[in-house]
Amino acid sequence: MRKYLFCEAGFVEKANWQPNCWINIECPDAADFHFLQEQLKVPQSFLNDIADTDERPRTDTEGNWLLTILRIPVQTPDSKVPYATVPIGIITNNELVISVCYHSTEMLPDFIEHTQRKGI
């Protein structure tokens, strides 16, 4: 799922991307990969690193791109442990912020909703 978010009074979703927006991608599909690699020219190695479920938090650079990998919680209802952590990649250059997570999360939608409620 791909969303284009713009900072106004909170993050506002719009139909198309433009420079200086946040592109949030959860559970990317083939069209998302094509968009990231062909249109935006995001390095393939960044997407491969984010896909590694054992990837540790770190930063990396390639050209004018910066990759920051963090680990965020996701619910695991079929496990004895209620939460596990998964990698999320924050990819930036001079005009874009792109977040890519191969799992559906509650954290980012909650963050977006919070910014809208607070108007920040």
Regions found by a protein language model. Give the residues of each.
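Peripheral, non-transmembrane regulatory/ligand-interaction domains of membrane transport proteins
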Residues: M1-I120
